Regions:
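Solvent-exposed, non-transmembrane regions of integral membrane proteins
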Residues: 1-851
């Protein structure tokens, strides 16, 4: 039965949210321009009521879509495309924003929340700010309308409540069965089945939403000709946006580090770049806004940068969702036909902001004060310029597909390709920009706080410089000791190392002074120390990352494989230890993850059923000394996830186990995810490059032998013994009838490092003979009880073999990567301290009636 009601309800909420947003924008516009207090109050109240209606409708849309996903209503295209009935609940949440419609909805939700916060905290600016807010919400709501205009072959938006049959109307099944409902959905992308994907997108979209607030205040300031006053209420929100958007970017990097297998945390993917660039410009805007607050300079620059940030957010949305990136990004959505609508959205606010700024430009106050080279304003300007250049370099190359489209649109011909080596291309530029930013953040702080004269520069910087020099020399010697003399030949690496150390040292001195006098002012110094540590961590973990899984056997794994494959990977046969990076490394076998209880299960210990998610325990299953299941228990597993147990043993005998994962999704293919051994000084990062697929390996023709009880024999060169044969009255959870006969053999197989018990079964049922073989997966052998010879007390066994289980592993050491993570924590802490200070400052002005 098709559940029409919930889809119709959701669609009703979509239309209501769109209409209410338009009504709110109109009412707030009228209220802002009203000449009488009575009309202003009337229209503002109408705007507020309309926006609350809009927000309630957005929540209604969210609830409706969650109901469809959670109840597995696969008659709806959205639920069918991105979920299945076996997904854990927390990944069902990820399904919500996996598609374009859901991510637009998430963006709308956060902006609705922020709009309500502004309505309740800032009555002075409510009218003009909420006009912009509501207008943006109307554009976003239009993206999920899914309405075809009467008389036009044009659809506005793409609805998350469309039925599968409406999208796949040409499918034969819907021709014969219009009400057909699939029993299962396509499932969630394996790479998104990660806990970071539950929290990273909401954080990132909250960052997107927060950039609207300073943009709205800036537009409101231009609109009302309150050119100076908008900065104070906008600054805390800019800091909030910088913190949240930065946190979202960092979460994405950490997700990539833990989930993808390229060995890093930033791949310079076009969509990563399209978020990174607005964040850079937002940081630049924060600095110019702070400069204006303190010296009334850089007001125009602040306006330009704040507007640019929001426009870049819209541009990144266009890049991601229009399909223009094609295959150049792993993050981009498929084109839902919204490219024209997205372009209108972008151009409306771009040209609207430009026109308003041009009209008001001459009225915007400026200062005639000459900026000295030794003034803080000068150094802020230089830093802002460098940040903008960093963003410009990245966005120009990222936008190559856009430039091609524009040239082709005007009759030209262009097929420029994005950089083949993205990491190398962007890094060679961003490295030098980062060095300059680090040095400026060190030196600029002294000009900001100390207001030093030219003759005092050397004195103020001497201690931080000498401290940095000493630490730098020590670390260079550590590099030579650890990586050899070649490690210091890259001048860029050495410069970024010194710049990072100098940033920490110089800002540390500033921080020490501020903590004694004014702790509330320390946010900038803390954030800059974090930036310095991040640069040091990036330099070590990326520049001095080392592959440790080298093939030292002198043998090729495969003549068809690349030189890199044969050189940089380690072949591990099961239970055969090898040496690697000061460890004894041993592959212990593949494992499955139990669904109901936290733990891994050895496939040797379970029987698979017709349902790939359900298995039966052959014996008591124990993991980490905890009994998970009893023999013959039926329980659920995650069949898509296969983990490979890699045991590391240090020189002191200490053991650590890694579980790198392969996800095999029937629709989306295989995806490898690493596991990481974390130490204070470095990470050991390992993932599976290749493996022996037991499903594809062919069994040899069975060798038949006759044995008696307790007789030893060889099973594929492994000493084995038939210990006993006993009658059984059930096979797994299935009870046998009294007329059935089943016997189970107990065969002990001695592997090189471990003993195994094989239990093949011989069944006579309804005068039919059946045989259930037993596979010892670790050894690549299969034993079958072929026949019973009561006259001689012998048993016929069939022995088959195939390739012994193995994996090919790639492992890397990431030195001092924890310095990077510590730096990110300090950056976020610095943002938090600065934000609290600006909020308190704003509240004090509110209490005085000045806001």
């Amino acid at each position: 039965m098709i559940h029409y009601f919930i889809g119709d309800l959701g669609h009703f909420f979509v239309i209501t949210s769109f209409v209410a947003a338009l009504a709110s924008a109109f009412s707030y516009f009228k209220g802002t321009n009203a000449t009488s207090l009575e009309k202003k109050i009337f229209w503002t109240q109408n705007g507020s009521i309309s926006f609350y209606t809009h927000a309630a409708s957005v929540i209604g849309i969210c609830i409706s879509l969650f109901v469809i996903i959670a109840n597995h209503y696969f008659e709806y295209h959205y639920a069918y495309s991105y979920s299945d009935s076996k997904l854990p609940d927390h990944y069902l949440v990820s399904t919500f924003w996996n598609g374009q419609e859901g991510s637009f909805l998430l963006w709308m939700f956060w902006q609705a929340v922020l709009g309500i916060v502004i309505i309740n905290t800032n009555k002075f600016w409510e009218g003009p700010v909420m006009t912009v807010f509501a207008l943006v919400q109307a554009f976003l709501a239009s993206m999920i309308l899914g309405v075809v205009l009467p008389g036009f072959d044009f659809r506005i938006g793409s609805s998350p409540f469309v039925l599968l049959r409406e999208v796949m109307h040409d499918a034969p099944i819907f021709q014969s069965q219009p009400d057909f409902i699939p029993k299962e959905g396509n499932g969630l992308n394996p790479l998104l089945q990660n806990y970071w994907m539950v929290i990273h997108p909401p954080t990132l979209f909250l960052g997107f939403a927060s950039t609207l607030v300073p943009f709205s205040f800036c537009i409101a300031g231009l609109w009302l000709k309150r050119y100076r006053e908008w900065v104070r209420p906008a600054l805390p929100w800019a800091l909030f946006g910088g913190a949240v958007l930065g946190l979202g970017i960092l979460m994405g990097g950490y997700w990539a580090y833990e989930t993808l297998n390229f060995g890093g945390y930033w791949n310079w993917d076009p969509v990563e770049n399209a978020v990174y660039v607005p964040w850079l410009i937002l940081i630049a805007a924060i600095h110019t806004m702070i400069t204006y607050k303190n010296s009334e300079t850089a007001l125009k620059a602040s306006m330009i940068l704040v507007v640019t940030v929001f426009i870049l957010i819209l541009y990144s949305t266009f890049l991601t969702r229009s399909g223009i990136l094609g295959d150049s990004s792993v993050h981009s959505f498929t084109d839902l036909g919204l490219s024209g609508q997205l372009l209108i959205y972008l151009l409306f606010f771009l040209f609207g902001a430009i026109v308003l700024a041009v009209v008001r430009w001459k009225e915007i106050p400026t200062t005639d004060k000459e900026v000295s080279t030794y003034s803080r304003e000068f150094w802020i300007f230089i830093g802002t310029l460098v940040l903008c250049l960093m963003g410009f370099q990245v966005i120009m190359a990222t936008s190559i597909p856009v430039w091609n489209s524009i040239i082709n649109l005007f009759g030209g011909s262009s097929n420029m390709a994005p950089p083949a080596d993205q990491i190398g291309y962007y890094t060679k530029f961003q490295l030098w920009f980062a060095i300059v930013v680090a040095l400026l953040s060190a030196v600029g702080q002294f000009f900001w706080w100390k207001k030093i004269e030219p003759r005092q520069i050397g004195k103020e910087l001497l201690v931080p410089f000498l401290t940095s020099l000493v630490i730098f020399v020590i670390l260079v010697n550590v590099l030579i000791f650890q990586f050899g003399s070649d490690s210091i030949k890259n001048a860029g690496y050495l410069l970024i190392l010194f710049a990072g150390i100098f940033t920490v040292s110089a800002n540390g001195k500033i921080l020490f002074g501020l903590l004694k006098s004014s702790p509330g002012l320390s946010g900038g110094a803390i954030a800059h120390i974090g930036i310095g540590l991040m640069l040091i961590g990036i330099m070590f973990s990326s520049g001095y990352s080392k592959i440790v899984s080298l093939n030292n056997t002198g043998l090729l794994y495969s003549r068809e494989a690349s030189e890199e494959y044969n050189r940089d990977n380690l072949l591990l046969f099961i239970n055969e230890p090898r040496s690697m990076a000061g460890y004894e490394i041993e592959y212990k076998g593949d494992r499955l993850e139990a669904r109901e209880k936290a733990g891994f299960v050895n496939p040797n210990d379970i029987e698979f059923t017709d349902d790939p998610f359900m298995v039966v325990a052959r014996k008591d299953i124990v993991y980490n000394k905890n009994k998970l299941f009893h023999a013959n228990d039926t329980f659920e597993i995650f069949p898509e996830n296969r983990y490979y147990e890699i045991q590391l043993t240090g020189t002191g005998g200490q053991k650590h186990t890694l579980f790198p994962r392969i996800q095999d999704n029937p629709t989306m293919g295989m995806a490898a995810s690493p596991d990481i051994k974390r130490d204070i000084s470095k990470d050991l990062y390992a993932h599976i490059v290749d493996l022996n697929d037991p499903e594809k390996a062919e069994w040899s023709k069975p060798e038949e032998i006759k044995v008696t009880a307790n007789q030893e024999f060889f099973a594929n060169d492994y000493v084995s013994a038939l210990e006993k044969v006993e009658r059984v009255f059930s096979i797994g959870p299935v009870k046998l009838d009294s007329s059935d006969v089943a016997v189970k053999a107990h065969i002990r197989v001695k592997g090189e490092y471990e003993e195994y018990i094989a239990e093949p079964i011989f069944v006579i049922r309804n005068r039919m003979v059946g045989r259930i073989p037993y596979e010892v997966r670790d050894l690549g052998i299969q034993l079958t009880l072929l026949n019973i010879h009561p006259e001689t007390n012998q048993f016929s066994l069939g022995i088959s073999s195939r390739q012994k289980d193995y994996v090919v592993v790639k492992a890397m050491e990431k030195p001092l990567i924890n310095v990077l993570w510590l730096g990110t924590f300090l950056v976020m802490t610095g943002f938090g301290v600065a934000m609290v200070r600006r909020i308190r400052e704003f509240n004090k002005m509110k209490e005085k009636g000045l806001e």
